[in-house]
Amino acid sequence: MIFFLLEGEREIITEICGSIIESNEKDIFKTLDKAVDLDVNYIELRLDVIENITSKKATSIIEKIRNVTDIPIILTNRTKYEGGYFPSTEEDRIKILMDNASLVEYTDIELSTNENLRQEVIDNANRTIISYHNFEKTPSSEYLENVVNSALNVGDIAKIAVKPLNIEDTYVLLRLLMEYDDLIGISMDKLGSYTRILGPILGSPVTYTAITDESAPGQFDVKTTRDILKKLKNY
């Protein structure tokens, strides 16, 4: 059982983020309309899946989104190494983020990014999510604590998403959420899917949800997430 981790009553303060993962503008705005209807708190715009993405194209899309809604944006341009699809060079990937970071509320940049390139993005961003993804395993608590500390030393929020190989791995993630504020923690796949609900109870500031198709293994859709959180504590 996992509920030994819960100590007293905890207020659920998490925000629901709907991920937009579409390859073309037509589908981006179809999904955006759904996100608006679902009243998400944030939208994550995944630049790495957009065909022929450039800085100029990213700027245009962001400006068009602003004409539709004032929902805060989390801008992501995920590297292939951490589960993304950006097809070009690391310098191009960073330039697109750097050129557009000031236009959005949050910019997601991987902790593994070259330190100088990462800092260029941070310097241009309003606020940052420093992320770490491991699709092979859940590292030790000590290792992940170092990851979180490193991320929070340079950014506003830390995000870790790891693959559990057994149920005990999911407890590692939950314990981290108990220890840290400003940590988004996700244990992936069906085995870890329950952490997407317990995470908000333990203080995770954002929970990522699917507007249409899931963007990560084990991810719930917006309606399911909100319904469960409401039942748990009048969310």
From Swiss-Prot:
This is 3-dehydroquinate dehydratase. HAMAP family: AroD (MF_00214). Its EC number is 4.2.1.10. It catalyses: 3-dehydroquinate = 3-dehydroshikimate + H2O. The gene is aroD. The keyword Protein biosynthesis does not apply. NCBIfam families: aroD (TIGR01093). The active site is at H133, K159.
